């Protein structure tokens, strides 16, 4: 079974995302911030990371920058899911190693 780590400080977004991903057959783990997300990746590297940009403790861009230099950190597909919708943020995310960029809010 494919695994997805949701890294988002919003409990509501994590809940909605979990529902969508489980419906698609993913096993889901959650983290409330980037540091917690990196800790989860140390325990078990997921196949996919659904990542918010603005979070306390460690932002999404800090998370992906650190993830991509770790052993095995180049493997997960990383999808930013954020309210940041300007071209500069999208470019920065893709340059840091994101595979996709989705705008919030989203429907399921």
How would you describe each model-predicted region?
Residues 15-23:
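Charged docking surfaces used in two-component/phosphorelay signaling
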Residues 104:
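A Lys-centered signature of the CheY-like receiver
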Residues 55:
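Receiver (REC) domain active-site loop signature in two-component systems and cognate sites
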Residues 32-36, 59-65:
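Acidic catalytic/metal-coordinating carboxylates
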Residues 87, 107-108:
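Conserved two-component signaling phosphotransfer/partner-docking surface
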Residues 30-48:
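Acidic, metal-coordinating helix/loop segments flanking the phosphotransfer/catalytic sites
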Residues 62, 85-100:
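Alpha4 helix (beta4-alpha4-beta5 surface) of REC/receiver domains from two-component response regulators
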